[in-house]
């Protein structure tokens, strides 16, 4: 294994996983394809068909009585889920023009999920509602650019209205309520997340993993989180969550940039010999060193991830020191006698597990001595007592202390089958993201109620022309669709109930419809709440993409390749004086 690693590294500048890297002697090969084009009404109609198809699949999951979607998978059992972004990502349409529209909605769902962590189904419903009305108005002769300006004007007014009426959450009960709503009414998940947040605090770290028992478990362990992610997406081990997850890895820390293969070759060989993943945290990892890591990962020879060290200057040095104490490793810098290319097993640290995303890294159950970790915390507290420190320096020290001394809550999802565990895990992750969003920006009345009340504010917005007025009207109608969809999924008359809500309780912001008890109530009192961040992000993302699609005048896709006709049968030989038959 060691010699194989070494020999593979020597060929790095030439090839990575069978792909030629452009170099001094590389000759780029350009391949062209024929294109199909559609214009005007035809283009927008095809996009709308794709948007509508995907939105219908996603919208059935919205609300406490939304339905599940069954998704076939290339490997393993079919997936059962109510997670909007999972449903959206699984859709691929045969018609390429329609698939363009579906892919744009997938981008909306993915972006909303990335920013807010929840609300993807609402964003999808809003995208369809805004785009369908925009297409209808453009077909009637309206100026698409003015419609877009009107839509953006209305969205700005709605966001301003929602921010003025949001409220902060402070109690564990409110956190449980937000989580319960996001988990489709599962009070067990709500209580579990509230308990986890109570254990580690609102700024604490909570992660979700698959458990090995039938019941769910909550475990609080020592660990650290810092805001640096993987350098390259080639390191990802879980494609769905876009994460790198390792168990019992070795950890290499360096204060300097790592570029040469020789710098990390001993550490790669040590990890290969012990059959353990390797985590490299350095000022930067690039050049042949990065290529070596990627090549070994892609070939399956070694699980490895490279991460930039957190912080800058002296703060980076201190944080690497904290990581060294936590993981029982050495930091390779000018102060150590041994250079990184001569790393020995005792120079590498370890931990129970590590999770790396595009933006941050979580290290759990470091192998460092508890006494040394506590001594390091006391040392930081001693430095903080210096009266000559600036506010910035105190803030950074407090941040280091919180990372080093704070625990990490791990929710282990249990179940009797893989399908059940995955479905429940999706709901817990959504609920966790909703709770984080609620804590950061506050909450609003749920079930689409805040959008319905905001729609009543859009009647008197001044605009420059009639087409912009129609753009405002598009948003006014569209933002009532989430509430209507939630009601329709529960088997109720969505239009009728939303109309009554506007007419009877238009001026009472917190009054909404309780589906469980079939009556109008104060949603704050019964705990039906939506995070402002989720609602706001979904509306902004949906309106931006939908109004932009409305300005489309031409759509271009790859033309299908023409299949070559099979050769005809050979002619029959002549008989006697007769000619052959063809």
Curated annotation (Swiss-Prot):
The GO biological-process annotations, alphabetized, read as: mitochondrial unfolded protein response; mitochondrion organization; protein folding; protein import into mitochondrial intermembrane space; protein import into mitochondrial matrix; protein refolding
* Main location class: mitochondrion
Q: Give first and last residue of the transit peptide.
A: 1-35
Pfam families the record matches: Cpn60_TCP1
Q: Which Gene3D superfamilies does its entry note? A: GroEL, GroEL-like equatorial domain, TCP-1-like chaperonin intermediate domain
This protein's source sits in the domain of life called Eukaryota
Q: What are the Gly residues biased-composition ranges?
A: 570-582
Keywords attached to this Swiss-Prot or TrEMBL record, sorted alphabetically, are: ATP-binding, Chaperone, Mitochondrion, Nucleotide-binding, Phosphoprotein, Stress response, Transit peptide
A molecular function (GO) term = protein-folding chaperone binding
According to the record, the residues making up region (Disordered) are: 561-582
Cellular component per GO, a single term: mitochondrial matrix
Residues that the record marks as modified (Phosphoserine) are 77, 92
Q: NCBIfam families, alphabetically? A: GroEL (TIGR02348), PRK00013.1 (NF000592), PRK12849.1 (NF009487), PRK12850.1 (NF009488), PRK12851.1 (NF009489)
> Which HAMAP family does this UniProt record tie to the protein?
CH60 (MF_00600)
Give the family from UniProt.
Belongs to the chaperonin (HSP60) family.
What functional role does this protein have? Answer: May participate in assembly and/or disassembly of proteins imported into the mitochondrion. HSP60 are ATPases and have affinity for unfolded proteins.
What name goes with this protein? Answer: Heat shock protein 60, mitochondrial
Q: Give the species this sequence originates from.
A: Schizosaccharomyces pombe (strain 972 / ATCC 24843)
């Amino acid at each position: 294994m060691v010699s194989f690693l070494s020999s593979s590294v020597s060929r790095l500048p030439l090839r990575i996983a069978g792909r030629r890297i452009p170099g001094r002697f590389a000759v780029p090969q350009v391949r062209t394809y024929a294109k199909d084009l559609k214009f005007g009404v035809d283009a927008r109609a095809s996009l709308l068909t794709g948007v509508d198809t995907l939105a219908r699949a996603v919208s059935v999951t919205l609300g406490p009585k939304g339905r599940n979607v069954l998704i076939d998978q290339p490997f393993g059992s079919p997936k059962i889920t109510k997670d909007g972004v999972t449903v959206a990502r699984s859709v691929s349409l045969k018609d390429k023009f329609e698939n363009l529209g579906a892919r744009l909605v997938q981008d909306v769902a993915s972006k909303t999920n990335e920013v807010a962590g929840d609300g993807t189904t609402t964003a999808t419903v809003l995208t369809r509602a805004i785009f369908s009305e925009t297409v209808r108005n453009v077909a009637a002769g309206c100026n698409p650019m003015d419609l877009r300006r009107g839509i953006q004007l209305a969205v700005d007014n709605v966001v301003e209205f929602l921010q003025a009426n949001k409220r902060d959450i402070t109690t564990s009960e409110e956190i449980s309520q937000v989580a319960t709503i996001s988990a489709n009414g599962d009070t067990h998940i709500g209580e579990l997340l509230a308990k986890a947040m109570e254990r580690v605090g609102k700024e604490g770290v909570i992660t979700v993993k698959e458990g090995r028992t039938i019941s769910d478990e909550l475990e609080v362990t020592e660990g650290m989180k810092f805001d640096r992610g993987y350098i390259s997406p080639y390191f990802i081990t879980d494609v769905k969550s876009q994460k790198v997850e390792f168990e019992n890895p070795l950890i290499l820390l360096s204060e300097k940039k790592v570029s040469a293969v020789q710098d990390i070759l001993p550490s790669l060989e040590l990890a290969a010999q012990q059959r353990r993943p390797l985590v490299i945290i350095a000022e930067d990892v690039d050049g042949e060193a990065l290529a070596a890591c990627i090549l070994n990962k892609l070939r399956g020879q070694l699980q490895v991830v490279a991460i930039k060290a957190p912080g800058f200057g002296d703060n980076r040095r201190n944080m690497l020191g904290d990581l060294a104490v936590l993981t029982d490793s050495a930091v390779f810098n000018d102060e150590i006698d041994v250079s990184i290319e001569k790393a020995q097993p005792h120079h590498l640290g370890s931990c129970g597990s590590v999770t790396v995303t595009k933006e941050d890294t979580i290290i759990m159950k470091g192998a460092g001595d508890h006494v040394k970790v506590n001594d390091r915390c006391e040392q930081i507290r001693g430095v903080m007592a210096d009266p000559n420190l600036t506010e910035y320096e105190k803030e950074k020290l407090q941040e280091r202390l919180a990372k080093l001394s704070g625990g990490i809550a791990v929710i282990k999802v249990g179940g009797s089958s893989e399908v059940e565990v995955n479905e429940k895990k999706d709901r817990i992750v959504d609920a966790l993201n909703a709770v984080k969003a609620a804590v950061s920006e506050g909450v609003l009345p749920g079930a689409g109620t805040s959008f319905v009340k905001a729609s009543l504010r859009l009647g008197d917005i001044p605009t420059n022309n009639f087409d912009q007025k129609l753009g405002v009207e598009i948003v006014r109608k569209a933002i009532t669709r989430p509430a209507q969809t939630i009601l329709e999924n529960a088997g109720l008359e969505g239009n009728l109930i939303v109309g009554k809500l506007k007419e009877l309780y238009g001026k009472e912001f917190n009054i909404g419809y309780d589906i469980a008890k079939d009556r109008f109530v104060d949603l704050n009192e019964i705990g039906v709440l939506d995070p402002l961040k989720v609602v706001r992000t979904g509306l902004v993302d949906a309106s931006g993409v939908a109004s932009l699609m409305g300005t489309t005048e031409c759509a271009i896709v790859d033309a299908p390749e023409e299949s070559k006709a099979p050769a005809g049968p050979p002619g029959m030989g002549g008989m006697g004086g007769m000619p052959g038959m063809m």
